[in-house]
Amino acid sequence: MIKTLSNIFKQDKEKFVIPRSVQQVIPIETIWSDGIFKIGRNKFARTYKFTDINYAVASKVDKETMFLEYMDLLNSFDCGGTTKITINNRRLNKVDFEKAILIPMQEDGLDLYRKEYNNMLLDKATSSNSMVQEKYVTVSCYKKTIEEARTYFARVTTELNSHFARLGSKCAEVNGEDKLRILHDFYRTGEESGFHFDIQESMRKGHSFKDYICPDTFEFEKDYFRMGDRYGRVLFLREYASYIKDDMIAELTDMNRNLMLSIDVIPVPTDEAVQEVEKRLLGVETNITNWQRRQNANNNFSAVIPYDLEQQRKESKEFMDDLTTRDQRMMFGILTMVHTAESKKQLDADTETLLTIGRKKLCQFSVLKFQQMDGLNTAMPFGTRKIDAFRTLTTESLAVFIPFRVQDIYHENGIYYGQNVISKNMIIADRRQLLNGNSFI
């Protein structure tokens, strides 16, 4: 086994504990107000939120440029830690929407028109997608103290900011309260406005932060789980197609449902990767030589090398070329996703839809059996990874799972301008916040 992978397995190895409460299902041990979470023995994680860019509507040349920049971002991931890219689909909170968008009444004789305008906005919000898509990068590392972890994350923050800026996206650190809000909104869907957490007050009273975010109940069955009044299921990508189009992630997350899709990335140092591929290539060449020797012993001197051995040799050489001449890196990847629904029937229908999308792309998704709790903690943006269904990928093949789709314009106290053609979400713009005030969108 590759040294990097065996080290990560050793570090991730923890004593198995059966959770005795809902709080114990959440794999966070300690939180700090700046957003760093301790998620295991000497394991720290930090989440960054990044904005979407107009990838789906870009020209072919622009798409290639964005794709190459995204490859550079993947190459910049540190070998000493693991990275998780998460796409979070959540329903628009009606209370927050009304607070941010609707015009408040002034009692000046014009409230009739304000009411009509507000009703129009509410109608549009109901007919539109009404889903908000948020994107996160969670970086986790093994450090002895929180000070060492802070130094490491400060360096990672600088690198991520520069790479996302080149892509035309903005990257920002998620603080402790905002990260707990993300988890609360997933665990307690429909109760988003009820979240309130003050870390200082919680410390003073000796309360656990988990009490503020956890659902009422957790019931894990063979192939689904119950979370309060909602049902959920975790899927993972079992088999990958030889060629995957770059719109696969966009199609999977286009569902009008609450879901989280995560891609765990473990980069391997190039020298280790080259040694591993050389070993594999040497093994293939040895098999071919032994096969030819057997044929010669049978006086068959014109035998053609079998197709499978020839294919193994060709693929090993291609992989070696990618690593040595095309500046790509070897990475291990896992794609997991969790989706929730209000009923078991709706959950089964949604699962079938997702499996169909996978089959359409010649990929096979599977439901995790008896691993729903581990799968849930892997798909959530904690930074933990409990599923080991790794796939060896190069930077180029991993970059196909590009998380970008289209940029939504949603300014607080903005004016309704129409509907986004791709995402079907409302365009709410405040011209004072735009780069150019003429409002060309």
Residue ranges of predicted features:
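Active-site-adjacent "gating/activation" loops or surface patches in catalytic cores
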Residues: F404-I441
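Extended, folded cores of ATP/NTP-driven motor/assembly subunits in large transport
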Residues: M1-V406
